[in-house]
């Protein structure tokens, strides 16, 4: 699929690499307000560069757009691309709020094209294995989920665009917490009640949180707890699902998060406790797998895994948790839709 990337920073480079791994020579154009950044990435992949994202929209040969900009630009770029009949994969969060995400979905539906939210964690092999075990009924009915995702930040983190709410839409909850919210919803379904505490423990970013603590409950009483942190000091990813007959755990994402592995534990009162462990070593191919599945979804005319609606629902949960933290009360996401 003939593709353009808007945003030549860390995520733009990561997405370009993933595109090459999964789609050959499909990158035609790179746009970034920093012309040197755009040119560097374009030279590496043998394509054209521009500093105007509007040039991407106007390029008739471009079939799909990868949006890798800060969140405040997501909606305007995506809506323009979708209205010109281009498919879009937009980095998370889909929008700074549900209204922006809704505009993108409406534009896609009106034009008959595909909008996808960048939720690459769904494509980590350990996550996929854990989901398979749950779907097979290996741990019985799910009772609760515990999700932890933490990074250390870096020098000057509080001076990056993430520290400006008008650009980012929020702090750690909307940045990394979105992944845990999306996975919890993928495993459990819709949540009817949300409660959150937010704190700024270390990074001086005004009203924005560097730690988010959340509890979410389904109408059936299943609970997900989530902690997303910019003060973990050593990168950590842990996603645990507990059922009536056992549990599954995902630990690590490779690289700085440690070896990625999926663990299945079965409850057996009459026998020695046993775990099955599968390790997934090597480079992180979740970005390439996400792009490959997106291309297949477009070709097959179906919703991709991590669809625009999934991005919208993650945005609604995020908004509900921010409202809960503000008011000190549990919030029903549907009331804010």
Predicted regions and their residues:
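Beta-loop-alpha module in the N-terminal Rossmann-like domain of NAD(P)-dependent dehydrogenases
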Residues: 15, 45-107
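N-terminal Rossmann-like dinucleotide-binding module
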Residues: 1-45
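Predominantly a Rossmann-like dinucleotide-binding segment in NAD(P)-dependent oxidoreductases
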Residues: 121-206, 328
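Contiguous beta-strand/loop segments that form the cofactor/metal-binding neighborhood of enzyme cores
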Residues: 182-256, 288-301, 337
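Hydrophobic residues in well-ordered beta-strands that form the structural core
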Residues: 51, 67, 89-90, 115-117, ...
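Basic phosphate/pyrophosphate-binding loop/patch that engages nucleotide-derived ligands
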Residues: 106-114, 128-143, 243, 247
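C-terminal helix-rich "cap/oligomerization" subdomain common to oxidoreductases
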Residues: 64-67, 295-337
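Active-site loop of classical SDR/Rossmann-like NAD(P)-dependent oxidoreductases
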Residues: 33, 279-292, 306
């Amino acid at each position: 699929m003939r593709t353009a990337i808007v945003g030549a920073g860390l995520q733009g480079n990561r997405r370009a690499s993933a595109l090459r791994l999964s789609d050959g020579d499909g990158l035609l154009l790179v746009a970034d307000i920093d012309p040197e950044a755009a040119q560097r990435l374009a030279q590496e992949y043998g394509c054209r560069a521009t500093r105007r994202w509007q040039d991407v929209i106007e390029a008739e040969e471009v079939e799909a757009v990868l949006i890798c900009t800060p969140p405040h630009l997501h909606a305007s770029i995506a809506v323009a691309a979708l209205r010109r009949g281009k498919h879009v994969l937009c980095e998370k969060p889909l929008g700074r709020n549900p209204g922006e995400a809704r505009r993108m979905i409406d534009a896609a539906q009106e034009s008959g094209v595909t909008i996808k939210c960048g939720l690459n964690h769904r494509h980590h092999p350990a996550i996929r294995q854990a989901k398979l075990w749950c779907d097979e009924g290996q741990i019985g009915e799910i009772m609760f989920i515990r999700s932890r995702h933490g990074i250390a930040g870096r020098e000057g983190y509080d001076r990056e665009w993430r520290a400006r709410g008008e650009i980012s839409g929020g702090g750690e909850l909307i940045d990394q917490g979105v992944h845990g919210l999306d996975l919890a919803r993928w495993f459990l379904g819709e949540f009817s009640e949300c409660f959150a505490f937010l704190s700024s423990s270390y990074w001086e970013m005004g009203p924005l949180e560097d730690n988010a603590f959340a509890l979410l409950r389904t109408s059936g009483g299943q609970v997900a707890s989530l902690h997303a942190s910019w003060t973990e000091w050593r990168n950590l990813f842990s996603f645990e699902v507990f059922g009536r007959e056992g549990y599954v755990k995902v630990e690590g994402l490779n690289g700085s998060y440690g070896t990625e592995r999926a663990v299945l534990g079965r409850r057996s009162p009459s026998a020695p406790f046993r775990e099955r462990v599968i390790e997934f070593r090597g480079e992180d191919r979740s970005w390439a797998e996400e792009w490959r599945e997106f291309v297949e979804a477009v070709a097959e005319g179906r919703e991709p895994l991590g669809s625009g609606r999934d991005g919208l629902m993650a945005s609604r949960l995020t908004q509900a948790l921010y409202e809960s933290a503000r008011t000190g009360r549990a919030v029903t996401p549907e009331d804010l839709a």
